[in-house]
Each structure stands twice: as structure tokens, then as C-alpha cells.
């Protein structure tokens, strides 16, 4: 009985696309696995990545949703996130903040 709204994108982001937004330089990292269209956002000047539901502190995102894939999420993390500098701070969508170095050393999925 409730009204619903359908939203349409004004722009579509692409892997490795660079954006300047609100004084920040951001690189889009397409990281499928949790969902086919999953992305992380890397701020190189701040040395920060927002990993959403891709990478968590000593864990990874769920892949049991339609379109999710454990092999894709591991590949995404290894190819896109583990190539970032060790001191990069990772802000996941849930739980504790971590670093790329910490995940390289202690994440059992990697």
C-alpha cells in the first residue's frame, strides 16, 4: 500500500575512474564479489579506502546473495586493495577500521 520511488543514475562510474568531489580526489575501484557492481573508493592523498562490504577487519563481505561470488571477492581484494600502500586506512561498511598491512598479515581469507 506504500508508494515507492525508482531512482535513475545521472552518471555511471567506471573502474579506475578518477573524481574530484568536494575538495577530495577519489579513485573508483570496481570490486565485484559481494555484488557484481561493488565498488570501493580510494582517496590517495588521504591514504584512505572506503571498502563497503568488500573487505572487513580480518574478514570479507558475504557472497551468498544473488550475483555474489567468493572467488570474485578474493580476486578483487587481491588485485585492487592489496596493491594499495600498507599504511592505507580501510574504513569498511561494518565493524572495526583496519589497514591494508593488517589485512595482508592477518586476514585468513587472503
Protein language model annotation of sequence segments:
Residues 3-7, 18, 25-30, 35-110:
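Metallo-beta-lactamase
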Residues 11-14:
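Short acidic-hydrophobic, aromatic-tinged amphipathic segments that line or gate anion-handling sites
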Amino acid at each position: 500500500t506504500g508508494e515507492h520511488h525508482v531512482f535513475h543514475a545521472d552518471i555511471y562510474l567506471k573502474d579506475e575512474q578518477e573524481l574530484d568531489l568536494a575538495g577530495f580526489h577519489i579513485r573508483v575501484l570496481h570490486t565485484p564479489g559481494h555484488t557484481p557492481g561493488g565498488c570501493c573508493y580510494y582517496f590517495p592523498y588521504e591514504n584512505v579506502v572506503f571498502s563497503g562490504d568488500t573487505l572487513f577487519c580480518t574478514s570479507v563481505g558475504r557472497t551468498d546473495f544473488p550475483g555474489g561470488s567468493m572467488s570474485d571477492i578474493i580476486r578483487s581484494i587481491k588485485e585492487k586493495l592489496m596493491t594499495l600502500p600498507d599504511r592505507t586506512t580501510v574504513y569498511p561498511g561494518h565493524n572495526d577500521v583496519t589497514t591494508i598491512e593488517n589485512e595482508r598479515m592477518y586476514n585468513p581469507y587472503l
